Amino acid sequence: MARIVGVELPNNKKVWVALTYIYGIGRSRSFEILKNTGVDPDKRVGELTDEEISKITKYIQDHFKVEGELRSEVERNIRRLIEIGCYRGIRHKLGLPVRGQKTRSNARTRKGPRPSRIKTKKKSS
């Protein structure tokens, strides 16, 4: 397994697919990286040479924020929105959809599970 920017990539996958395992790299970015480093996208990760792995790693580190750095930036941005008290920040704080979706009947994932009601036994008279 090749290790690129701290992520173990499976040997049996094609390189362009394996790069999408890295947080912050999707399909189009994966192809961009491989085009600029001169690596064949259809090559398997197990077939990569050490030189190709180091070229890919260097390109990613020089051009993109990925993994922990990207996660912390996103988290900081959300914290800032909450701190300044804007509409989006309030929605984040309340755990509701942020981008204008309706919430009357949907948004179950974002709202979370409903609090369950305590069942009481009926007295038999």
UniProtKB/Swiss-Prot annotation:
GO cellular component: cytosol; small ribosomal subunit
GO MF annotation: an example: structural constituent of ribosome
Protein name as catalogued: Small ribosomal subunit protein uS13
PROSITE patterns, per the entry: RIBOSOMAL_S13_1, RIBOSOMAL_S13_2
NCBIfam families: uS13_bact (TIGR03631)
Organism of derivation: Thermotoga neapolitana (strain ATCC 49049 / DSM 4359 / NBRC 107923 / NS-E)
SUPFAM superfamilies cross-referenced by the UniProt entry: S13-like H2TH domain
Quaternary state and interactors: Part of the 30S ribosomal subunit. Forms a loose heterodimer with protein S19. Forms two bridges to the 50S subunit in the 70S ribosome.
Keywords assigned by UniProt, alphabetized: Ribonucleoprotein, Ribosomal protein, RNA-binding, rRNA-binding, tRNA-binding
Ranges of compositional bias, category Basic residues: 101-125
Name of encoding gene: rpsM
InterPro entries: Rbsml_uS13_C, Ribosomal_uS13, Ribosomal_uS13-like_H2TH, Ribosomal_uS13_bac-type, Ribosomal_uS13_CS
GO biological process, one term: translation
Annotated stretches, region: Disordered: 97-125
